[in-house]
Regions:
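Terminal domain-start leader segments
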Residues: 1-51, 85, 106, 145
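Flexible, acidic/His-enriched mid-domain "rim/lid" segments that flank
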Residues: 4-6, 75-163
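Generic hydrophobic/packing signal
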Residues: 16, 20, 40, 60-62, ...
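Short, well-ordered alpha-helix to beta-strand connector turns
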Residues: 18, 67-68, 88, 108
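Short, polar loop motifs at secondary-structure junctions
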Residues: 26, 53-60, 95-101
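Hydrophobic beta-strand segments of well-ordered beta-sheets in folded domains
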Residues: 47-51, 68-69, 88-92
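Compact, glycine/acidic-enriched structural inserts
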Residues: 52-79
Length: 163
C-alpha cells in the first residue's frame, strides 16, 4: 500500500515538475514512511525518502519507518536549516505553518503549497487498512455508548460524574 501511495506522489512530482515533496503533517508522513511523529518527510525525485526528526524521535523513526534515511536534527525552526540542505529545484509541500512557509519561501521563492497530492494518495485503502478503520470506528461507537449512559440529558456537567 505504501509503495502505491509513494508511486502516486511520484506521479504528482512528474506532472507538476516538483523535484522534492516535503511533508510536515504527521498523517502524511505516516502514509509516506510508516512513521507517525514530530518530523519532516522528504520524497526526492529519484524516489529516496528521508525523515528529519528531533533527537527524541530518531530511534522510533528508524524502527517504524520503511525504506527511509533518518537524519537527526533540532526541533522547530532549526530543523528548517537541515531541511534546506536536501531541497533542490522546485519544491512542493503540505506545510500549514505560516512562519515556516515564509522561511521556506526566502530560500525557495517558487515553492508550491498543496495538500491535494497527499489526500489523493490516502484515498486508496487495502483490506488491512479498512479492518483497522472499522475497529477504530467500533471503539469510538462503544466509547460514545458508555458516555451516553453515564451522562443524562439536562444535567449540568459538574453533576454528571462521567469519570
Amino acid at each position: 500500500m505504501r509503495i502505491r501511495r509513494k508511486r502516486l506522489l511520484k506521479n504528482f512530482q512528474k506532472t507538476t515538475g516538483c523535484d522534492t515533496i516535503v511533508t510536515f503533517e504527521p498523517e502524511n508522513l505516516f502514509y509516506l514512511t510508516g512513521f507517525w511523529g514530530e518530523a519532516i518527510g522528504i520524497l526526492e525525485k529519484n524516489g529516496n525518502t528521508t525523515i528529519i526528526a528531533p533527537e527524541l524521535e530518531v530511534g522510533r523513526a528508524k524502527d517504524e519507518s520503511t525504506d527511509c534515511n533518518v537524519i537527526k536534527s533540532d526541533r522547530g525552526v532549526s530543523s528548517l536549516g537541515t531541511l534546506k540542505k536536501f531541497l533542490k529545484g522546485k519544491v512542493c509541500t503540505d506545510c500549514q505553518n505560516y512562519s515556516m512557509m515564509q522561511s521556506l519561501r526566502k530560500s525557495f521563492p517558487k515553492i508550491k503549497n498543496s495538500i491535494e497530492p497527499f489526500y489523493r494518495s490516502r484515498e486508496i485503502k487495502d483490506e488491512k487498512e479498512i479492518m483497522l478503520l472499522k475497529k477504530g470506528s467500533k471503539i469510538i461507537d462503544d466509547m460514545f455508548g458508555i458516555c451516553a449512559k453515564k451522562s443524562r440529558l439536562g444535567r449540568k456537567n459538574q453533576n454528571s460524574n462521567l469519570f
